[in-house]
Amino acid sequence: MSAQASPTLRVVPIHDVDLEQVSDLVNRAFATYEIFKGQRTSPLDYLEEAGEDARVILVEQEGRLIGTGMIARAERFTEPEQMGPAGTERPDVAAPLDADHPWAGALYFGLAGVEPEVMNRGIGRMIVSHVERLARAEGFPRVALGTLLEFGLVAYYEKLDYRTVHTAVYPPEHWSIIVEHSHFEMVKDV
């Protein structure tokens, strides 16, 4: 039996990727949580959510996509119901973020997924590490992300030195999720 090749990682502009393949992987990964009604995303929804200037992280092994994530300037993700530091009012989406806002100037990381059969083998950590290195290299002061408590990833990110800057509890049906869920906005200085 031959050894498997090590995974390779590359970052490409969103318009240079097969969004069908990427959104299918995200859907398989998110399906493991069993809290979504239907699919997490579609190619069109992925593009709309990520934005035209987003870049996509692709982790491949022997020609097969096994991990992915999306990065873009965090200011793009300033929807009033989505973000704001704990205990403060939400920013006006038309206004730029205050310089002291935790997501101001940050690189946002989201829409991440790992092929279920290779989960817990370091692929996600490989992606997060690359995002952090890329943020430093490109002059971003921090990385921002959002996760649900129900995914069990808050403690994981805390171990990687991310800190929670806002939490919100949403009712079932919000974001096509079938249960009440807690959204955590987190940042890490890089």
Give the positions of each predicted feature.
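Active-site rim helix/loop that mediates acceptor-substrate recognition in acyltransferases
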Residues: 31-78
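Conserved GNAT acetyl-CoA-binding A-motif
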Residues: 106-107, 135-148
